[in-house]
Amino acid sequence: MSGLPTQHAVPALVLAYFAYYGVLGIFIPYLGLFLDGRGLSSYDIGLLLALVTATRIVGPSLWSLVAERQGRPLRIMRLGAVLALLGWLSSFFDYGFWLLLLGFSLFSFFWTAILPQLEVTTFHFLNDNTSRYSRIRSSGSVGYIVLVLVGGVLLQSFGTEALPYGAALLMLLLIGSLFLLPELSAPTENSAERKGFGRLLTQPVFLCFMGAAFILQMSFAPFYGFFTLYARDLGYSGVATGLFISLAVLAEIIAFFWMGALLKQRSYRLVLSCCYGLTMVRWLMLAYLAHSPLWLAVSMLMHAGSFAIAHSCAMQFVQHYFPKALRSRGQALYAGLIFGGGGAVGAYAAGILWQDGAGATQTFVIAAITAGVAMLCALCLPAQVHAEPSKRAAH
């Protein structure tokens, strides 16, 4: 085993989450502005985001399978980070839509090798302690909030072309942190567990959970793809936009710290359905009240429920639903179908509906309706997910 001793892996995990989500702090909020600065229409932006996001459908499961068969998840993370950086370098050059599509698609495909393995690695070192996971995961939120603020300053001071360079520096930091982590030994997986994985995917509770998460992720697409353009059109500066996004992530950080206690006191179904309902209200506020800084700030605070608590619930579901030997595969499946599939469908639809800003209100209204449908699906889930049902499925 190379790298840091196991007991000292937590600082490296904290740094890895900080850098990983720091990259996303530049990539996600400001990508719409960056592409707009390159002369792309809202339809082109939506199409590019959809095609790039679609690489996340297959990527996580493919990389997870490779990591599982090799028994070396850390090597897969390192390889993914290095190759993602190489793909990202294409954004330094302005040669039109197709080069951006190729470069960002390569970046996204290799980027998907990182997070599922990082989540599994984290739970391994924490002995499946979800409360400690939430605290370590919050370092990613800190990275996101810091880089959103830095991105706003870069945007206002140097323009959109400065953003790719900031993200590249964070990728180098991520690569360094991954080389500090110790390698994991391959988990023991018996043949019954291998056969049981397929059966798990057809269980009603799993289908209901994935359907709800998929639909909710679709509703996030207008926010992720077009919020910075929306804020600019409403008259907010780049720094102000960064502050609003940072407020959302600050609420997310606070939520991660008391997430464990919340799930002990309330049912899984209640918490998740409330988060989805809150998301519906949030998109309606963006549709009709975003011109008011106060109400825009309130809608950003709702990110604590619509993302942070909902994400922690989803991670707990995956950890409890799949046995330890299959969790990497379960994490990859979740990441691919939800963030890849749901994100791609939502991004493409948002690009069509946005109409270069003319359809902004109706886009967020449709997003709210979509979140409402996700809430109805969540209400059909069991109150709690306690055991690993795969053990039953394998018999």
Give the residues covered by each predicted segment.
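Juxtamembrane intracellular "pre-TM" segments in multi-pass secondary transporters
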Residues: 2-7, 181-213
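Interfacial helix-cap and linker-helix signal at transmembrane-aqueous boundaries
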Residues: 35-36, 66-67, 138, 153-158, ...
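A membrane-interface helix-boundary motif in multi-pass transporters
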Residues: 153-169, 352-371
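Helix-to-loop junctions at the C-terminal end of transmembrane segments
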Residues: 58-72, 155, 254-267, 354-355
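Structural signature of the two symmetry-related core transmembrane helices
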Residues: 75-89, 270-285
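Helix-loop boundary and gating motifs at the non-cytosolic
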Residues: 3-53, 206-244
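Cytoplasmic helix-loop-helix junction between adjacent transmembrane helices
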Residues: 105-139
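Helix-loop junctions at membrane interfaces in 12-TM secondary transporters
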Residues: 10, 92-104, 287-299
